[in-house]
Every structure is written in C-alpha cells, then in structure tokens.
C-alpha cells in the first residue's frame, strides 16, 4: 500500500480540498484521520461547487472508497445532511462509498451547547471555536466517558452513556437548553440508517492492503494541533503527521508522500496569536481579493503575509516531501510582497525556525520581513510554470530555498479544478 498524506501547514483553510480532489482521482481509498464537522473546504468539479465538512473529498471520484477514521468525531445529523447534499448535486452512489470507523466518537448536540457555554465563560479569553462541540467531544473521549460510533448499535449502552453525559454537564452548568430524551429519540431512527456505514477499521484496511494508492486527507492544520499548535488557541485533535499515523494505524514505512498545503499568504479564523497578521489595507485587500470567509462558520478570516518561521516549524514536525502553494493569483495586484523571515523576541532573541510554546510570547514577537517585488499581471488559470511572470516564479523559488529545498510541486492559480500548475 502506497500512502500519500495531505496536511495543512498553517492555520487551516489552505485549500487542501483541491489537491485532495486531484489526487483522489488516482486513489483507491481516501481517509479522514481527525476532526469533525468543524472542518470545511470547497471543491469545484464540472462547474458544481461541493462543500465538505466531515466527509472525505474522495467522494467526488466515483472509483474512490472513503473512510472516516478512528480519530474523528462524528455528528451524525451532519453526516447524513452532508451526504444528502452531495448526492443532491449529482454524486450518485456516494453513500455506497463512505464508511465510518466504529472507534470514532459521536459528537452530540449536547456538545455544541456545552461548547457555547465554555466559550461564554472564557469571555475575552475565548478560543474562538466553531461552536460545533468538537472540544467537549474530544474532552469526553480523553476522560473515557465518550460514546463511540459502534456503541450506537447497543441501544441500552448508548442511552445510558448519553444520559450520564447529560447529567454530568447539568451538574456543571445547571439547566441546559438541551433535551436528552429528544436526542435519544432521534438516534432510534439513526441506528438502523447507520448500519451500512459502520466498519471495523483494521478489517476494512485489510481489504485494501494491496491498494497501490491510499490518500489521507488532513483536517485543520499543524498550527491548530493540540500539541504543536498555538495552544490553547487550537483544535482538540492531533492534526499533524503523527495524528494521521496514530488515528488510522498506518505503517510509516508505507508512506510515500507527505504534501504540505500552504497559502501564498497566511490566514487564520478565530482567536489566537498571528504574528504576520496585517491589520491594515494589505490585510483588507488579501481578505477581499481572496474572498476569505470560513466555509464552516462564514466568519471573516484574518489575513497576513507568508510566514517562513511558521512554515519551517511546520515542516520540522510534518516532514513534507512536497508543497502545494495555493491562491497565488490573490497576490497578482500587489506592488510589493512581504515574507516573514524571523521573529524577534522582546529580549532581542531572533528566531528563524522554531515557534515559541508560550502564547503570550507569540503575541509579542516582532516579525522581520524581506520585501519582494510583485508581478502586477494576471496569473488566474495559468497551468504551466513557465507561463508565470518572472517575479511570481522568483517568489515561489525563494520560498523553496528558504524551506530547505522542499519542492513546490503544485501551485494553485484560481478556484476551478484545473487552475493548478503541476511541476514535475
């Protein structure tokens, strides 16, 4: 089994969907390793726009079987709603090519209610979650009180565990705007509907042990990783290479490619440190031209310049074999383009390839930039590297050199599926 892993290298929203969609055309199997319906990306295929959250992007390819893996958390109503939406847009038979590990955890409406209450208690220190209940669900998993997807099939066990969760949160928060019996009633219907989708992950993988091409689709990104990201302003799962290997029980020796997806600039949704953020006309222009609004929340994304310190750190953890640089065309109309090359701490220490663990330190670094000339010409839809303006090629090659020679193999030049340069 040859395994390709696609990972976000910044704070998410890098455009992982397009490269995953492209690679899935040759894949036998596409897997989601972590996260839940908090993730979001868009794929444009045959002029139809598909929004993905919990489902793997490989569903767009009619020959690709898809798995929601053991490290994920599954909001069952969202699973069925998203599947119906995809089938309604023409992806017929998608429901026969999607499976869920019985070891994945169930994200309940209860978790969404608790998510909102926890954010409200934090006040000005809130994390800026999507409000989907992902954090509380992973908290229950870590505390060994969560409900696994496979347990939905045992009605008595399922109902006992959900009522216990509800009782615990009621003791903590008081009366909740949530009806546990109503949710239990909904799962009486979901129980039978879920039967065709639930699988033993290891047994499932044995069916594909001879697959020449397995694709792993990362959700979120390295800087949102629970261990390696800008803690506590992170998601609640392991979003890097290690998380994918763990959640899907992958053989590291079978990994042939690790693709880091990076925007040609940097964005972030929600709260937390963002050293290269531009709270000025440059940030506004990046946001406007790049149409930077979250697929899941609709929130305006914060925007800033490309951050080499962040990307060197991300590469050191995820060990990328190649990069996909996305949204190059957004930079077409800039006279000059800045790249963050170092952080300077308050005591004068200069960092170039490590990221401070302390969020307070992250908030107070000063970024040292280099300024590169813009190209002031249209790159939208360009498909050959040699057709890019010289300064655009220089920008890409500068990033390659500064990241230790990791090749930028794919370059996104627009939203359409074929707006992509593939460098051999």
UniProtKB/Swiss-Prot annotation:
<feature type="binding site">
    <location>
        <position position="40"/>
    </location>
    <ligand>
        <name>Mg(2+)</name>
    </ligand>
</feature>
<comment type="pathway">
    <text>Purine metabolism; AMP biosynthesis via de novo pathway; AMP from IMP: step 1/2.</text>
</comment>
<feature type="binding site" description="in other chain">
    <location>
        <position position="235"/>
    </location>
    <ligand>
        <name>IMP</name>
    </ligand>
</feature>
<feature type="binding site">
    <location>
        <begin position="295"/>
        <end position="301"/>
    </location>
    <ligand>
        <name>substrate</name>
    </ligand>
</feature>
<dbReference type="InterPro" id="IPR001114">
    <property type="entry name" value="Adenylosuccinate_synthetase"/>
</dbReference>
<dbReference type="GO" id="GO:0044208">
    <property type="term" value="P:'de novo' AMP biosynthetic process"/>
</dbReference>
<dbReference type="GO" id="GO:0016208">
    <property type="term" value="F:AMP binding"/>
</dbReference>
<dbReference type="GO" id="GO:0019002">
    <property type="term" value="F:GMP binding"/>
</dbReference>
<dbReference type="InterPro" id="IPR027417">
    <property type="entry name" value="P-loop_NTPase"/>
</dbReference>
<keyword id="KW-0963">Cytoplasm</keyword>
<dbReference type="GO" id="GO:0004019">
    <property type="term" value="F:adenylosuccinate synthase activity"/>
</dbReference>
<feature type="binding site">
    <location>
        <begin position="412"/>
        <end position="414"/>
    </location>
    <ligand>
        <name>GTP</name>
    </ligand>
</feature>
<feature type="binding site">
    <location>
        <position position="144"/>
    </location>
    <ligand>
        <name>IMP</name>
    </ligand>
</feature>
<feature type="binding site">
    <location>
        <position position="13"/>
    </location>
    <ligand>
        <name>Mg(2+)</name>
    </ligand>
</feature>
<dbReference type="GO" id="GO:0005737">
    <property type="term" value="C:cytoplasm"/>
</dbReference>
<feature type="binding site">
    <location>
        <begin position="40"/>
        <end position="42"/>
    </location>
    <ligand>
        <name>GTP</name>
    </ligand>
</feature>
<feature type="active site" description="Proton donor">
    <location>
        <position position="41"/>
    </location>
</feature>
<keyword id="KW-0436">Ligase</keyword>
<feature type="binding site">
    <location>
        <begin position="327"/>
        <end position="329"/>
    </location>
    <ligand>
        <name>GTP</name>
    </ligand>
</feature>
<keyword id="KW-0658">Purine biosynthesis</keyword>
<comment type="function">
    <text>Plays an important role in the de novo pathway and in the salvage pathway of purine nucleotide biosynthesis. Catalyzes the first committed step in the biosynthesis of AMP from IMP.</text>
</comment>
<feature type="binding site">
    <location>
        <begin position="12"/>
        <end position="18"/>
    </location>
    <ligand>
        <name>GTP</name>
    </ligand>
</feature>
<feature type="binding site" description="in other chain">
    <location>
        <position position="130"/>
    </location>
    <ligand>
        <name>IMP</name>
    </ligand>
</feature>
<keyword id="KW-0460">Magnesium</keyword>
<comment type="subunit">
    <text>Homodimer.</text>
</comment>
<feature type="active site" description="Proton acceptor">
    <location>
        <position position="13"/>
    </location>
</feature>
<feature type="binding site" description="in other chain">
    <location>
        <position position="299"/>
    </location>
    <ligand>
        <name>IMP</name>
    </ligand>
</feature>
<feature type="binding site">
    <location>
        <position position="301"/>
    </location>
    <ligand>
        <name>GTP</name>
    </ligand>
</feature>
<dbReference type="InterPro" id="IPR042109">
    <property type="entry name" value="Adenylosuccinate_synth_dom1"/>
</dbReference>
<dbReference type="InterPro" id="IPR033128">
    <property type="entry name" value="Adenylosuccin_syn_Lys_AS"/>
</dbReference>
<feature type="binding site" description="in other chain">
    <location>
        <begin position="13"/>
        <end position="16"/>
    </location>
    <ligand>
        <name>IMP</name>
    </ligand>
</feature>
<dbReference type="GO" id="GO:0000287">
    <property type="term" value="F:magnesium ion binding"/>
</dbReference>
<dbReference type="InterPro" id="IPR018220">
    <property type="entry name" value="Adenylosuccin_syn_GTP-bd"/>
</dbReference>
<dbReference type="InterPro" id="IPR042110">
    <property type="entry name" value="Adenylosuccinate_synth_dom2"/>
</dbReference>
<feature type="binding site" description="in other chain">
    <location>
        <begin position="38"/>
        <end position="41"/>
    </location>
    <ligand>
        <name>IMP</name>
    </ligand>
</feature>
<dbReference type="InterPro" id="IPR042111">
    <property type="entry name" value="Adenylosuccinate_synth_dom3"/>
</dbReference>
<keyword id="KW-0342">GTP-binding</keyword>
<comment type="similarity">
    <text>Belongs to the adenylosuccinate synthetase family.</text>
</comment>
<protein>
    <recommendedName>
        <fullName>Adenylosuccinate synthetase</fullName>
        <ecNumber>6.3.4.4</ecNumber>
    </recommendedName>
</protein>
<dbReference type="Pfam" id="PF00709">
    <property type="entry name" value="Adenylsucc_synt"/>
</dbReference>
<dbReference type="GO" id="GO:0005525">
    <property type="term" value="F:GTP binding"/>
</dbReference>
<feature type="binding site" description="in other chain">
    <location>
        <position position="220"/>
    </location>
    <ligand>
        <name>IMP</name>
    </ligand>
</feature>
